[in-house]
Amino acid sequence: MKNIFRKFVFTIFVCLINLQLIAASFNEKIPLYFKLTNENLLAGQNALNIDLCDSRIKEWCTKPQRELGLNGKKINDYISISPDIKGEWRFGWWYNINFTPESNFVAHQTYKITIEDYIFPNFVGLKSNNISFTTLPLLPIIKEMNYLQDNIDISKKFVQTKIAFNYPIDPKTLEERIEFIKSSTKEKLPFSIKFNTNNTEATIITNIPPLTDKEDTISVIIKDGVKPLHGGEVFTYKNVKDPNNKTPNNIRYSYKENVLIPSLSSYLKITNSTATIVKDDKLKPEQIIIITTNTPVSGEEIKKHLELFLLPQDKPAFLGVAGKKNYKWQNPKEITDDILKSSEKINFELLSSVPSITTMHSFKVDTFASRALLVKVNQGVKTSDNLTLGSDYFQIVQIPDNPKEVKLMSDGSILSLAGKRKLPVYSLGIDKLYLEIDRINQQEVNHLISQTNRYNIFQNPTFINEYTFNEYNISEVFQEEVIVNSQNLNLPHYTDLDFSKYFNLEEAGSYSKGLFLAKVYAKDNNNIISQDKRLILVTDLGCIVKTDKTGTHHIFVSYISNGKPAGGVKADIIGLNGEVLVSSKTDSKGHAVLSNINDFSKEKTPVAYILTTKDDFAFMPYSRIDRQVNYSRFDVAGAVSSDQGLKAYLFSDRGIYRPNEQGHIGIMLKQTDWQGKFDGLPLEIQVTNPRGKVIDKSKIVLDAEGFGEYLFSTLDDALTGLYNISLYLVGDKGSNNYLNSVSVRVGDFQPDRMKININFNNSQDELWTNPKDLKATVNLINLYGTPAENRKVSGFIDIRPTEFFVPRFKEYKFYSSKGNKEFFYERLGDITTDSKGTANFDLNLEKYYNATFNLTFSAEGFEPDSGRSVNASKSLIVSPLPYIIGFRSDSDLKYIKTKTSAAIEFIAISNKAEKVAAPNLTLNLKKINYVNNLVADSNGNYSYSSVPIETNISSDKINITANESYIYKVPTKEAGDYVIYLTDKEDTIFAQAEFSVIGEGNVTANLTDKANLKVKLDKDDYTAGDTILLNIITPYTGYGLITIETDKVHNFEWFKADENNSIQEIKIPDGFEGKGYVNVQFIRDIEATEIFISPFSYAVVPFTAGIYKHKQDIGLTLPAKIKSGEKLAIRYRTTNPGKIIIFAVDAGILSFAGYQTPDPLNYFINDKALEVRTSQIMDLILPERPLLMKAYMAAPAGDGCINVARNLNPFKRKSQPPIAFWSGILEADLDEREVTFDIPSYFNGTLRVIGVASSLDSIGTSKADLLVQSDLIINPNLPLFVAPNDEFTVPVTIFNNLKDSGNAQVFLNIETSEGLKILDYPKEIPIDENKEATINVKLKATDQLGSADLKVVASINHLKPDIISMAVVHSSELTSTTSVRPASPSVTTVNTGFITDNKANLKILRDVYPEFAKLQISASKSPLAIISGFKDFLDNYPYGCTEQLISQNFANILLYNEQELVQILKTDRKNMDESLSKIFQTLSERQNYDGGFRYWNNFNDDSDPFISVYAMHFLSEGATRYLAVPSDTFNQGIYYLENMANRSINSLDEAREKAYAVYILTQNSVITTSYIANILKYLDEYHKNTWQDDLTSVYLAASYKMLQMNEEAEKLLDRFTLNKPISKTDYQYYNPLIKYSQYLYLIAMHFPERLKDFDPKIVQDIALFAKDNYNSLSASYAIMASLAYADKINHVDEATIKVTSTDKEVTLKGNKVMIAELSVENKNIDLTSSSNGFFYQLLTSGYDKQLTENKEIVKGIEITKKYLDENNKEVSKVKLGDNITVEITMRSGSNKTLSNMVLIDLLPAGFELLPDNNHINILERTQEVMIWKPIYINNRDDRVMIFGTISDQKMTYQYKIKAVNKGIFSTPAIYSEAMYDPQTYYRGVIGNIIVE
């Protein structure tokens, strides 16, 4: 006790000292010293941690309580370590410094760390600014050393050793210095060794000799001399013994270890034994004893040595100890010889297993349940490699209790009324069954359906609210107890549940016929221990319902007992209240039609189909998914017609457009009967951008033929990505009916200049190709028609597994024995094309000669000296097989009845898809037997699993001839599963056919519940009125329904099939056109024995009829070749009078876009979906009781739009418009007409001309290509953009197309505009006629920003052959452009302040380019000075969430009627109107159904409360000024605010939002006193001491004021303190500038009288807060406050302010805001006022010429950007044409998540985004790095812009770029910022990358 007291006193004493020191530390310097916390871990690449400790307390490391303000900061610039090691230094969260090394420490090396003391605050004093430490020596840990043996190949025995080191080691030095020694012989054993990827862990396998009769030991020792991989002291065992070298978890460092090697009699062990209950295939429970061993042993061997004893139930008395009744035996040591003698020896049966030698052995016993068994395995058990069980094994196991179970048999719910009406009940271990039959009144079906679950009502009827409404509300209940008459309750018992006695057929008017809820359960002491229930319908009426496009219902009814159509059946649809909605009767064909009821609702909501006759009743739930037939596995997809029978087809002229381009969309509309006229039809086009926002709605008028066009326009700031142009039919009440759409892509692109083709040397029209000598030929062609010679081509092969499919023999199944199971990818290198543009690749497939695989050869062809390229790929099957063998059968091979005839046909096919001979084959027939293998699942539960074993039956030699197939007659005498193998003399398998022969009571292991129906039509195409012949192969006998369907049912036929193979027919109706579907539904015969598969099967097969009737032929006549700059004349004609559109497009654009020529005929005729929905109850039919019981005796039961305009490149190059011509709609008929287009002089290439024509009842397309060529064709490859000082090479290819010019000298003259400087180029070059040559022009980008031109003029002085000595100059010129843009994005900074005296000097710290730059000073005696810069900042704000768009426009509303200020600010009134109109429209689009507004234009986003209030504030101000605010948007917004004000409050931020909402509601004449009371109640309860100083109270005060409750308002204001600090939270809509601005605004608007005594410092503070802490919201609020305040103050003295800058002096006069525009060259600005005290605002906007010191700026976010090669290694030099990955890694610099972040990454010049993956993050997630998932990505040709949320964990984003030009290029500085926190941003550094 004394010691405890002393410790307590000492602790109190130290704490008091500590508290004194803490208190003193706020007034004096805190002396700190450095303490290394993890010195015993410093090795390898482990992190280093340093604590900063208060040196005044020596006993332990005490950390001061005063914040350093350095948490999370990266401090590499302030710390040095010697010797140097790269890594990241960072402050931790509390007086802690962490170092994460990028490379390994040196072993046993002393390091010195020096920390600059000026990084610390002034209150810190360092005892020393350095600390030293020594890393650990190289030390090993032998983690594992175990004897192991392979349980599959038991001869393999080995020792596995795992050794870890604390540093990466030199692998070779360990191999030389490690030994494994066998103790008995002292011999050194050989070993193999593998290292992990960083060489810190070795896994060593030591094979050992065969075991002997004696145990042995193997030792491992690591000798001195193992070397660390990265330098330092080598390993010595003395360091292991050093007690100072300890691991943190007390893991022992070690250099030697040993392991015991067992003897022959010590290794084999019985590891476990247990008893369990497992059901056999007859559902009979079996008692199983399971014995497991540690190594495989034969079950027979265990059986020989196994004894099982049933121990006595009672423990006998022994040596005076009393016995015990019902004793639970547990310990084998309790079993004496006497007890063993009194035990009963139990017989057992070994269960077969696969394989027979295994570690788990199962024995079946039959003994008493709940009794104990002694398991004894006598010593002497031997394995095949002589391992022996050295001692007896004893274990007591408990036999489990017998299971108790009850269930209704089979699946299904319908019993035939004409049958036995009985359903067996399966029971086990049950002596009494409790039955409950709830007979449901027919009139209550509506309640049954509406009150139960919507899925699977028959099999699992569950009432939704069973405590208030259940089966007893709608039924009559019958209960019965049934005694189970069974001699052995442990065997399955079957009790019939007879439904006949529960209904009376004689009661003609009875409404309680055949619908029951059957329940069966078992009890134990009145507790239900097992139960089952099922809805049972006893009926003879089966139905199929087909609902067509119009909602019409076709009811097909048949008798279940005989399959005949049921005539005279009343068919109704009933509603929710039970009343009949529509009714009809079936005709003699069992068919009835019920009309459309889609518009029925409320009490008439349809719930069921009801079928009734005099004495029968059936029903089916209406529109339930479990009753609908799923056709997804059939080819039923296609276009869907509108409700009005209209189909529309839209096509674009080229599929891809750059921003700010226009495109043409063609529209074609037809009625399904081709009869309609369409002039005057109300149609609308809607254009949706990639974010899902509708950006255009336009009314469209078509001509009578249904032909029209739409002009698609894009803006310069258009989002890149996929746009949908949709056509709608406008309804009567403004509702739109969708017809169709076309998608086009908007993005920067370069048209292809070449075409690439691939061919293989020996694969013409072949199914497969032999791999020997296989070659691929790549042909490159310039799109102006000449071979592309001397071009680099890269080749790649991709090899994957495949299967054969032969279209000509699609009914046959083919098998490939040469199975390649792996994937391979190989780069074949580069080849240069020859004079024909050809490159030949030898594929070198020798290593794959013995495999069959799918080969894809890919080629990439490059433009000369450029990285731009075209790609192509081609696939084929490669195999060495001489032929393949396929088989088919007219029988269903899964279900062949015994003693029936069935055959399998085999054919041999060559690679030409022709039948060939296949001699000398062997046909092996094998039977598949199934062994019930006992297996354990993951939970330890045991069950039988059927394992197939093949047994040889017969082997026959066969031949397949070329003319005849081989017909194999299937042996069907004996039931079972069989497999046929066809092999050649090398035992290569050519075919494998499996079949099952089904006999009575035989159900094989592979039966499924799916019934496959095979249907084949006699042909694919028909004429209307033809009869279709169907070959139907059914899984059982029965009857069926055949229908012809499209969007309606055209015809139907019932049929009956007494055999599994039958021919049926159905007629195509007269007048049928286009694509249709033959739908076959088949129902199992009531007497059929195939009861373990579904009684309902179906199949759908498409066909066509009359498809050429509506084809329109088009004749296009045009020249094959034309010169650039000439006029192209196209002559056209059509076979039928109508209209035509002709368009011509650069084939390079179409190639890049992957454009498909319009094919409207195929769409209107063939592209038609199956639109009839089918529902049925046939799959619920239960098998008859005798069939069911017969089978069960033998087998088991079958149970926000982001506007990034200002982030675009404003220095865009002036690109040439794309080559695309559009004629518009022209008249066309048999007379030939002409249309002309002007070909630009700069275009050379292929022009594709396409014509699309339409008449009332015909349509057609046609296309033709022509070449456009100049005498000299010039193709430069200029980068799309460059940065100042980039030096690069531009390849210019010139093709000599001048006839008779020979080997001509081509003279070159190259000029550039100011943005480019020529460094070098050749002035002339010889070029042969019809040849090309490439020159390289060396250029440098200058500081002149904007579009820069490169003009190339090539000329030939050509001597005319017919005029001697007369030379004619032939020349061509081409001007190409690039963008010279800075290597950093545009940044706007605003410097705001208040000057107390009359002078100020402002420094301009930025050096910006003059282009798009702005330097503006505004000044005033009033705070109006701040509105100019902030308005400019908002007008050019680069992002566009809902808040930012509102903030951009709030000033426009507030200034709308302020004419003087509008003029001073030079605001354009027209622009104001356009901007306001746009924001009103945007707010309407971003409004949710609840009336609130989304943050972005993402349709799934919830309404944002603050944004919604802010939006309504904006709209309210607009409505006050009588602007065109959408009334429905406004009214819905008010509704949202009312609901919002009623919600519960969970925080002060939420209270402020609700107070703001109440303020807006009050402003709009809503009585809000109750809302205010609720808010005040919450505030007083949860924020009693803080809320009075929050902006919340000012909003409430203003609301009180508007409610004329002045006293309450004044009280709130009097208690409010403005300058109370704001608590730091993650809430982003509240900061000091917002608080001060809104306070001033509310006071000025509602309490102007308080302005008389207003502290002017409040207004001045707004300017000071705005100095460096503004965002879009706070800037908007600051403008709002300034305007309101200026409007209310009585008088502002006129002032004169002189502005003196470098270039000029300006004198400003006025009493409002005064503005001066200055040159961006200024570095200093002096302001001199005529009186003291004025506000100013300095705005600087533009692109920085050089980043300050080119150092990264890290403000709360850290970003790393790397360029990685294909091996993920960082590179600064790449080769032309390389694809590289840009990897951006980022994380928050604090412990909080940063939301609303934007990241802008400019591409280096000479690179282009890869089109395939530039829109997604290509990374896969790893454990180390989180993959960033941005909210939105916008890609342009020179930049990637990404928006999202960044956490405090490392997050990585990747995209790929391609090097396309040689040169030295600037790598731009990456930039990121938080859109709501100006203090959080990042700017990287500018570097260089070389492309060579």
Curated annotation (Swiss-Prot):
Please name the InterPro entries in this protein's record. Answer: A2M_N_BRD, Alpha_2_Macroglob_MG3, Bact_A2M_MG5, Bact_A2M_MG6, Bact_MG10, Macroglobln_a2, MG2, Terpenoid_cyclase/PrenylTrfase
Q: Which SUPFAM superfamilies match?
A: Terpenoid cyclases/Protein prenyltransferases
What one GO molecular function would you report for this record?
A: endopeptidase inhibitor activity
Per UniProt, the keywords (alphabetical) are: Protease inhibitor, Signal, Thioester bond
Q: Which domain of life is it from?
A: Bacteria
Q: Where is this cross-link: Isoglutamyl cysteine thioester (Cys-Gln)?
A: C1441-Q1444
Q: CDD domains per the record?
A: A2M_like
Is Zinc-finger among the key words of this record?
Answer: no
Q: What's the short name of a Pfam family annotated to this entry?
A: bMG6
Record bears the keyword Signal: yes
* Secretion signal span: 1-23
Identify its protein family.
Belongs to the protease inhibitor I39 (alpha-2-macroglobulin) family. Bacterial alpha-2-macroglobulin subfamily.
User: What does the record give as the function of this protein?
Assistant: Protects the bacterial cell from host peptidases.
Please state what the protein is called. Alpha-2-macroglobulin
> Source taxonomy lineage?
Bacteria, Pseudomonadati, Pseudomonadota, Alphaproteobacteria, Rickettsiales
